Protein backbone atom coordinates (compact mmCIF):
# COMPACT_ATOMS: atom_id res chain seq x y z
CA UNK A 1 0.00 0.00 0.00
CA UNK A 2 1.96 2.98 -1.31
CA UNK A 3 -0.15 5.65 0.49
CA UNK A 4 0.46 3.93 3.83
CA UNK A 5 4.20 3.88 3.23
CA UNK A 6 4.16 7.58 2.29
CA UNK A 7 2.33 8.38 5.55
CA UNK A 8 5.08 6.69 7.59
CA UNK A 9 7.42 9.55 6.71
CA UNK A 10 5.09 12.04 8.42
CA UNK A 11 4.86 10.05 11.68
CA UNK A 12 6.59 11.01 14.89
CA UNK A 13 5.34 8.04 16.95
CA UNK A 14 4.25 4.57 15.89
CA UNK A 15 2.26 2.59 18.47
CA UNK A 16 2.03 -1.18 18.11
CA UNK A 17 -0.35 -3.50 19.92
CA UNK A 18 1.97 -6.43 20.55
CA UNK A 19 -0.16 -7.92 23.35
CA UNK A 20 -3.57 -7.86 21.71
CA UNK A 21 -5.02 -5.60 24.43
CA UNK A 22 -6.38 -3.15 21.86
CA UNK A 23 -7.02 -5.34 18.83
CA UNK A 24 -8.35 -8.41 20.63
CA UNK A 25 -9.80 -6.66 23.71
CA UNK A 26 -8.09 -9.12 26.05
CA UNK A 27 -5.07 -9.44 28.32
CA UNK A 28 -3.07 -12.59 28.99
CA UNK A 29 -1.63 -13.32 32.42
CA UNK A 30 2.02 -13.98 31.58
CA UNK A 31 3.48 -14.62 35.03
CA UNK A 32 2.43 -14.93 38.66
CA UNK A 33 5.51 -14.35 40.74
CA UNK A 34 6.34 -14.26 44.43
CA UNK A 35 8.47 -11.45 45.82
CA UNK A 36 11.60 -13.50 45.10
CA UNK A 37 10.75 -13.57 41.38
CA UNK A 38 9.73 -17.23 41.17
CA UNK A 39 6.42 -18.51 39.84
CA UNK A 40 4.17 -19.24 42.82
CA UNK A 41 0.72 -20.88 42.69
CA UNK A 42 -0.25 -19.07 45.91
CA UNK A 43 -0.02 -15.77 44.05
CA UNK A 44 -2.38 -17.06 41.36
CA UNK A 45 -4.71 -18.46 44.03
CA UNK A 46 -5.00 -15.13 45.85
CA UNK A 47 -5.37 -13.16 42.61
CA UNK A 48 -8.14 -15.55 41.52
CA UNK A 49 -10.03 -15.21 44.81
CA UNK A 50 -9.94 -11.42 44.45
CA UNK A 51 -10.87 -11.37 40.76
CA UNK A 52 -13.60 -14.01 40.92
CA UNK A 53 -15.40 -12.87 44.07
CA UNK A 54 -15.42 -9.11 43.43
CA UNK A 55 -18.89 -7.94 42.44
CA UNK A 56 -18.14 -5.07 40.08
CA UNK A 57 -17.63 -5.39 36.37
CA UNK A 58 -14.65 -7.62 35.79
CA UNK A 59 -11.93 -5.76 33.93
CA UNK A 60 -9.53 -7.35 31.47
CA UNK A 61 -7.01 -8.12 34.22
CA UNK A 62 -9.64 -9.95 36.28
CA UNK A 63 -10.68 -11.98 33.25
CA UNK A 64 -7.04 -12.87 32.49
CA UNK A 65 -6.52 -14.09 36.07
CA UNK A 66 -9.71 -16.17 36.00
CA UNK A 67 -8.84 -17.63 32.59
CA UNK A 68 -5.34 -18.62 33.76
CA UNK A 69 -6.66 -20.27 36.95
CA UNK A 70 -9.23 -22.18 34.89
CA UNK A 71 -6.44 -23.92 32.91
CA UNK A 72 -3.96 -24.40 35.78
CA UNK A 73 -4.12 -27.77 37.58
CA UNK A 74 -5.05 -27.66 41.27
CA UNK A 75 -2.43 -28.88 43.72
CA UNK A 76 -5.12 -29.50 46.37
CA UNK A 77 -7.95 -31.23 44.50
CA UNK A 78 -6.81 -34.07 42.20
CA UNK A 79 -8.02 -33.99 38.59
CA UNK A 80 -9.34 -30.45 39.03
CA UNK A 81 -8.38 -27.04 37.72
CA UNK A 82 -7.35 -24.40 40.24
CA UNK A 83 -10.22 -22.03 39.42
CA UNK A 84 -12.96 -24.63 39.92
CA UNK A 85 -11.30 -25.92 43.07
CA UNK A 86 -11.31 -22.42 44.59
CA UNK A 87 -14.90 -21.71 43.51
CA UNK A 88 -15.99 -24.87 45.33
CA UNK A 89 -13.98 -24.25 48.51
CA UNK A 90 -14.54 -20.53 49.24
CA UNK A 91 -17.46 -18.18 49.72
CA UNK A 92 -17.47 -14.41 49.71
CA UNK A 93 -18.03 -12.66 53.03
CA UNK A 94 -17.46 -8.98 52.23
CA UNK A 95 -15.86 -6.55 49.81
CA UNK A 96 -14.19 -3.15 49.78
CA UNK A 97 -14.76 -1.94 46.19
CA UNK A 98 -12.06 -0.45 43.99
CA UNK A 99 -11.71 3.30 44.09
CA UNK A 100 -9.25 5.48 42.25
CA UNK A 101 -7.73 7.08 45.37
CA UNK A 102 -6.86 3.71 46.99
CA UNK A 103 -6.10 2.01 43.64
CA UNK A 104 -6.95 -1.39 45.07
CA UNK A 105 -9.90 -3.72 45.69
CA UNK A 106 -10.32 -6.10 48.61
CA UNK A 107 -12.54 -9.12 49.14
CA UNK A 108 -13.00 -11.19 52.28
CA UNK A 109 -13.54 -14.90 51.68
CA UNK A 110 -14.15 -17.86 53.99
CA UNK A 111 -13.28 -21.52 53.56
CA UNK A 112 -15.49 -24.45 54.65
CA UNK A 113 -14.11 -24.26 58.21
CA UNK A 114 -15.06 -20.57 58.48
CA UNK A 115 -11.46 -19.33 58.35
CA UNK A 116 -11.50 -15.92 56.69
CA UNK A 117 -8.92 -13.99 54.77
CA UNK A 118 -8.85 -10.61 53.11
CA UNK A 119 -7.31 -10.61 49.66
CA UNK A 120 -6.33 -7.26 48.17
CA UNK A 121 -5.19 -6.62 44.59
CA UNK A 122 -4.04 -3.34 43.14
CA UNK A 123 -1.34 -1.09 41.77
CA UNK A 124 2.04 -2.40 42.92
CA UNK A 125 3.36 0.84 44.46
CA UNK A 126 0.17 1.47 46.44
CA UNK A 127 0.17 -2.12 47.65
CA UNK A 128 3.78 -1.83 48.81
CA UNK A 129 2.85 1.29 50.78
CA UNK A 130 0.31 -0.62 52.89
CA UNK A 131 2.25 -3.84 53.42
CA UNK A 132 4.41 -4.38 56.49
CA UNK A 133 5.13 -8.09 55.98
CA UNK A 134 6.19 -10.25 53.06
CA UNK A 135 5.70 -14.00 52.68
CA UNK A 136 8.95 -15.86 51.98
CA UNK A 137 8.80 -19.65 51.66
CA UNK A 138 5.35 -19.63 53.28
CA UNK A 139 6.50 -17.64 56.32
CA UNK A 140 5.46 -14.03 57.00
CA UNK A 141 8.50 -11.85 57.64
CA UNK A 142 8.85 -8.09 58.20
CA UNK A 143 9.13 -6.13 54.96
CA UNK A 144 12.59 -4.61 55.34
CA UNK A 145 13.96 -1.67 53.37
CA UNK A 146 16.33 -4.09 51.63
CA UNK A 147 13.51 -6.43 50.59
CA UNK A 148 11.39 -3.45 49.52
CA UNK A 149 14.22 -2.21 47.27
CA UNK A 150 14.58 -5.71 45.78
CA UNK A 151 10.83 -5.89 45.04
CA UNK A 152 10.84 -2.42 43.45
CA UNK A 153 13.80 -3.43 41.26
CA UNK A 154 11.91 -6.56 40.20
CA UNK A 155 8.83 -4.46 39.34
CA UNK A 156 10.96 -2.01 37.32
CA UNK A 157 12.47 -4.91 35.37
CA UNK A 158 9.05 -6.33 34.55
CA UNK A 159 7.79 -2.88 33.53
CA UNK A 160 10.85 -2.50 31.27
CA UNK A 161 9.76 -5.73 29.52
CA UNK A 162 6.44 -4.05 28.75
CA UNK A 163 4.52 -5.97 31.40
CA UNK A 164 1.93 -4.38 33.65
CA UNK A 165 2.56 -5.36 37.26
CA UNK A 166 -0.31 -5.83 39.70
CA UNK A 167 0.33 -6.83 43.31
CA UNK A 168 -1.78 -9.08 45.50
CA UNK A 169 -1.66 -9.40 49.28
CA UNK A 170 -3.61 -11.35 51.85
CA UNK A 171 -4.27 -11.24 55.55
CA UNK A 172 -5.65 -14.26 57.35
CA UNK A 173 -7.96 -13.83 60.32
What annotation goes with each model-predicted range?
Residues 1-173:
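Conserved cytosolic headpiece of P-type ATPases
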